[in-house]
Amino acid sequence: MVYIGLSNHMKSSLSQVLKMELQQNGWRNPKKAQSTVGHCLDRLVWIAVVMMLWVCKVDLHAQPEIRVDVLLNAQSNASFWMHPRVGMVPHDQDHPMAVMTLQETDREGTHMYHGLSTMVWDSRDKKWSSPQRDSALARRVDAQGLIEVFVDATPSWHSKTGKILLTGATFWLDPQLKKHLPDGGSDVAYSVLDLQNLAWSPWSKLELPSEPKFHFARAGCTQRVDLPDGDILLPIYFGGKGNDSRHKAAVARCRFDGNVLSYLEHGNELSIEVVRGFVEPSLCLFQGRYLLTLRNDLKPYVAWSMDGLHFSKPQVWRFDDGSELESYNTQQHWLVLPDACYLLYTRRGLDNDDIFRHRSPLMMSRVDSTTLQLMKSTERQVLPKLKDGFGNFGVCQVSENETWVTAGRLRAKPGEGSVYRARILW
């Protein structure tokens, strides 16, 4: 018999079943053998179905149910909400809950962020609290009236300490210019949530080596990986002069004791001589390899590593038909399941030439972990096409059967949806 597409182990198993049936049911008798073969084929069909389902269990994730809702509407002519990202207190804890940080942003000016706000989803009543500002995450004003603000933040559960650790970056803003300082510095910033009081610690700065290249250093909009010993692999990017300088990306190994985040080392520095270089890197661990996706002004890139610190030369993101992803100047993030890995992104070619930087709809595709290409046939829309688009979004694994993707709608007007959530049900 020929078993198309089955492993040697499966072929052997099917052959053994057929042999046993023929031996037990009289294969020497032609009439009986004819009946036995039919019976065997029935058995083989069922076994083949089970084995095919086992082989294709990853493909069962290809068409999840996606439900989109609006968590917040814009309420002011002066501002809208951006950078909504969720950290999940796991269900094996006494009080599982989701904690979202988000940021009110002035409609006038560029990067005119206010202090971070927090919303909490209680697993008992399944409701969200209204956004609350915390003085610990507020803007800080220096003697010259310049504003330093904690931005681009991502909350994530740290299992070793049982804390939600919020990581991001700082921006220096000039209220007179209504924009960030062109040559202003930046630091990797963090805060820790007290789960009992739902209060954040005053935001602090990660101490990096005293080198000029770290004058502008950030962990903005990044996804990190926590190691079994509690150490953290935190993607960062840095450039000497400011936001508009050329940046390099690397992964920093940090230690977190539940209160203080400390730098230990960082791996090889990834660079590209194209516009602002590599920014907003996000990291994941899938099937024993660390994958790093990188934003660039013109194209997105991906690199891999076995130790989470030393990465391959970045390659342009492509689909498995060889075509480029056609995303640009916008972050990408990972969605990782035990047996499948997805990339979330925005791109050209979706009847969206009227959208700023083609930042909607928000899409996802499964990653071929061997080639590091995206499987075009698995591409799905996660969030719809909307005027002005998304771009600044987060991904949170709520449970083994549910993933949330949260995004802020650029320049939403009063009454319009400002914070969107996609519930991906596996």
Q: What is the role of each PLM region?
A:
Residues 2-6:
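Extreme N-terminal basic, low-complexity initiation segments
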Residues 7, 12-15, 35:
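Serine residues within intrinsically disordered or low-complexity segments
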Residues 9, 19, 50-51:
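Residue-level detector of intrinsically disordered terminal segments
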Residues 18-47:
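Bacterial N-terminal signal peptides that target proteins for export
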Residues 45-55:
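Bacterial N-terminal signal peptides
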Residues 58-61:
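Sec/Tat signal peptide C-region and signal peptidase I cleavage site
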Residues 63-80, 88-148, 157-217, 225-280, ...:
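Beta-rich carbohydrate-recognition and catalytic domains
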Residues 83-85, 152-154, 221-223, 280-282, ...:
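Conserved beta-strand position repeated once per blade in WD40 beta-propeller domains
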